[in-house]
From Swiss-Prot:
GO terms for cellular component: cytosol. The gene is ahcY. Binds 1 NAD(+) per subunit. This is Adenosylhomocysteinase. Substrate binds at residues 128, 153, 183, 187. GO terms for molecular function: adenosylhomocysteinase activity. Its EC number is 3.13.2.1. It comes from Thermococcus kodakarensis (strain ATCC BAA-918 / JCM 12380 / KOD1). May play a key role in the regulation of the intracellular concentration of adenosylhomocysteine. Its cofactor is NAD(+). Keywords: Cytoplasm, Hydrolase, NAD, One-carbon metabolism. It comes from the Archaea.
Amino acid sequence: MDCTKDYCVKDISLAPSGEKKIDWVSRFMPVLQHIRKDFEERKPFKGVRIAATLHLEMKTAFLLLTLKAAGAEVSAAASNPLSTQDDVVAALAKAGVKVYAIRGEDREQYYEFMHKALDVKPNIIIDDGADMVSTVLKERQELIPEIWGASEETTTGVIRLRAMEKDGVLKFPIIAVNDSYTKYLFDNRYGTGQSTWDGIIRTTNLLVAGKNVVVVGYGWCGRGIAMRARGLGATVIVVEVDPIRALEARMDGFLVMDMMEAAKVGDIFITATGDINCIRKEHFELMKDGAILANAGHFDVEISKPDLEALAVEISEPRPNITEYKMADGRRLYLLAEGRLVNLAAADGHPAEIMDMSFALQAKAAEYIKENRGRLEPKVYVLPREIDEMVARIKLASMGIKIEELTEEQKKYLESWEHGT
């Protein structure tokens, strides 16, 4: 482990490998490239301190370097102990980002590193799962006067932050980047859909076609996972608690069951709910021999590991990132990536082209917080529609796509109430 006052990484000599990774993904992130060019010229974050808790891999690295190029002092820690890529973190440290993260860090190190990142006394926080905001509110209240606001990347994080708002404990404004159209319609659906299966297939090297895939949760992430499972030839079963989403899943052509019924027939189970213990003891007891369990939600609580451990008579690791739990009756259940985010713990996360839009939003959210400091209440906000549309237009242009424009006649018609039947 290489540590100084400005970084703590596994091995700083890994930096050249990380630099190559960052350079590769940057070529497929035209929206963030566009914003970076603008930021480099204007330096909107000169003198601004930004602390981030993110999955520290190549796409997030390009975001952090974009903010640094904009003049910010940037610090960062991991948002998940297993998603860190050590070579990328080394490259960030070499580039002058104050970064503290090591793949496989334990819980104590996780929070120690987060506190180190917070020692920069941030004006802006970029969060992924709301752990950094929560830590500030509970343990680092002395930082609050310096904080103008924070942005949140994930559905899980936004749920936590809205709960904080409801309880009246928020002390600064939050921008829910996750709730922007160019985030959840693309990142959550197409990004999660592809990267979750990338993680599962890389880890298991098993066939998906012909299997029963149980998707627990039919939000935008669940929709993407189910869509790609069908494309791979699986029979897809959706488990939901929301009657409207359950009905939508059925109308989309998927089977819908409760968890007890799905547990009996599933070959691969994937959770994407943001809630706790969605698959637990009574479900494990019904599963087939060889059932595979994976999680696509932010925290490792959706599949009950304590229940698996209590039921198992033997625990082993047949392959990297796979834990085998042997039951008393001889059945074997396989948990991928310790129940953590399978797409990041067992693969490289979302495709660069998808994160291009999400991280463009994060960069603009940071600028929005700076420009509106002192004018926003301690509430959860969504970015203005014009920022969403700006990101979409730049993305379309990078794809060589030109869209139609309303004529003046059409605009006038849409604004009028006088024309009827």
